[in-house]
């Protein structure tokens, strides 16, 4: 009996301990948590039914306004969302106007709830914009922005903007907005025309008091695709966004652009302005950088062509690619108003193996800097089946530290300059000879370590539309690197001319690959 009583008491004690442990476990893990799977369920359901085009609810007065008028509509700072919440992040919202004519739904996610953030005209100062107050009562938000004390502890600056289609922009400390990222690109540069998916709904997690990151979910929709996105934003000297996406195709597409970047290139040293301009360069980005799966680094200077141009680089399991702004000296741009020297580079760092595919660069003619005419993305060789999810993860860096965006073991292209080719005559006067000259400066720690008399040579190739008439490599005592000079004779000016070059020392490759295109009709 004593043994039985003791055994019974022991079992009771064990059950009490187990019950307490279960209670502690339940209380330690939230009973409910919002995740990308919740958004993915909606995306999958959307993809299983026909696309419903969003309907504009915007009065003509707002739809027809000019950009300068739209800028007059400002969010009231004292209405910033989370003003009364202990968090360094604040939210503000964009009003509908111009081509931002369709409202997007924006929700706040807490530990226990999901609540829509309702539009109210009182959020906005309409300034000199004359309007009927009744006409804006039932409108909505066009998008939102995130504020954070990134530059000064006592001042909130804008660090994220999500406005229009699936576009978003992010900046780090000391940066200003430049290039944009997108959620997805469909049929870019195809004759059938491009399809622009849009984020139709957002869910933003309310940060905890000590959180230094912000989580944003988005539901993407378009005639042939739907998708779920999770963005985790880490503001800092270089702001970083971890992106997770689950994309479902409604119908077949010709081309699917993953991790698209959009930028602007008007002119620069490799393609000087056709009209006299005090600015040496005017661009948000000046080159495409690729770190291929086989380890090769490629640098492709950007162009503003006279005709649509598409360049393709076969890359299996890319290690990274991006649109960069190399050259951070103010004297490279000389623009006090638009400060192109402060605009960030965008670098995509894939997570996991993406498989076989291509990095594609699209260059579109533009007459001025108001048009984003550069697009870069990765496109898979095998598209997902309709209704089957395409899962992709990557990290997006917004940085001005381009020195970190290339291998420390090889040199990189500091600058590319283009001019008319010439030959020095016996009287020392340079005479143009109908060729195109390229000056390419390579710099890097490995070149600095070489003696200036080292046997550095070039490996150069050119397409069928051109021939190399000069190929010269010399030490540059100013940069402690090496300068490559090429003179190219073009056979048919109506066709583009492709060329590639790298520097070597014997069997050792010293530099990244310079991959250049001379556009047609230059």
From Swiss-Prot:
Residues 1-33 form the signal peptide. It comes from the Bacteria. The gene is mdoG. The lineage of its organism: Bacteria, Pseudomonadati, Pseudomonadota, Gammaproteobacteria, Enterobacterales. Keywords: Periplasm, Signal. Involved in the biosynthesis of osmoregulated periplasmic glucans (OPGs). Pathway: Glycan metabolism; osmoregulated periplasmic glucan (OPG) biosynthesis. This is Glucans biosynthesis protein G. It is found in: Periplasm.
């Amino acid at each position: 009996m004593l043994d039985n009583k003791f055994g019974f008491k022991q079992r009771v004690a064990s059950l009490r301990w187990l019950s307490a442990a279960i209670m502690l476990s339940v209380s330690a893990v939230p009973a409910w948590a919002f995740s990308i799977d919740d958004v993915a369920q909606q995306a999958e359901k959307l993809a299983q039914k026909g696309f419903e085009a969003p309907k504009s609810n915007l009065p003509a007065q707002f739809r027809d306004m000019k950009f300068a008028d739209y800028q007059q509509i400002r969010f009231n700072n004292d209405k910033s969302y989370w003003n009364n919440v202990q968090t360094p992040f604040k939210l503000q919202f964009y009003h509908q106007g111009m081509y931002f004519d369709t409202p997007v739904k924006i929700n706040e996610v807490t530990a226990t709830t999901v609540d829509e953030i309702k539009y109210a005209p009182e959020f906005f100062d309409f300034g000199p914009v004359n309007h009927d107050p009744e006409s804006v009562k039932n409108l909505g938000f066009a998008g939102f922005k995130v504020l954070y004390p990134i530059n000064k502890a006592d001042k909130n600056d804008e660090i994220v903007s999500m406005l229009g289609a699936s576009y978003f922009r992010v900046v780090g400390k000391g940066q200003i907005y430049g290039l944009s990222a997108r959620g997805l690109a469909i049929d870019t540069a195809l004759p059938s025309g491009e399809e622009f998916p849009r984020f139709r709904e957002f869910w933003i997690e309310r940060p905890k008091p000590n959180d230094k990151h912000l989580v944003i979910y988005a539901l993407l929709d378009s005639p042939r695709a739907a998708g779920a996105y999770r963005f985790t934003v880490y503001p800092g000297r270089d702001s970083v966004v971890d992106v997770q996406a689950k994309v479902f195709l409604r119908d077949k597409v010709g081309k699917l652009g993953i991790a698209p970047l959009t930028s602007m290139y008007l002119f620069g040293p490799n393609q000087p302005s056709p009209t006299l301009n005090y600015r040496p360069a005017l661009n948000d980005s000046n080159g495409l950088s690729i770190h291929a799966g086989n380890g090769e680094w490629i640098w492709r200077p950007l162009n503003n062509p006279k005709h649509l141009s598409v360049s393709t680089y076969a890359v299996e399991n890319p290690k990274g690619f991006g649109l960069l702004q190399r050259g951070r000296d103010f004297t490279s741009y000389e623009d006090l108003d638009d400060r192109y020297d402060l605009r960030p580079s965008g670098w995509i760092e894939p997570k996991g193996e993406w498989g076989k595919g291509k990095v594609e660069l699209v260059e579109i003619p533009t007459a001025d800097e108001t048009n984003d005419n550069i697009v870069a993305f990765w496109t898979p060789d095998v598209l997902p089946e309709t209704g089957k999810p395409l899962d992709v993860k990557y990290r997006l860096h917004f940085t001005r530290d381009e020195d970190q965006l290339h291998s420390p073991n090889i040199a990189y292209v500091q600058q590319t300059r283009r001019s008319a080719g010439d030959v020095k005559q016996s009287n020392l006067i340079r005479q143009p000879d109908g060729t195109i000259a390229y000056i390419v400066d390579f710099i890097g720690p490995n070149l600095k370590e070489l003696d200036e008399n080292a046997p550095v040579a070039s490996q150069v190739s050119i397409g069928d539309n051109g021939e190399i008439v000069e190929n010269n490599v010399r030490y540059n005592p100013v940069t402690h690197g090496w300068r490559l000079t090429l003179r190219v004779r073009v056979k048919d000016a109506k066709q583009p001319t492709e060329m590639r070059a790298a520097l070597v020392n014997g069997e050792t490759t010293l530099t990244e690959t310079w991959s250049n295109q001379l556009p047609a009709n230059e």
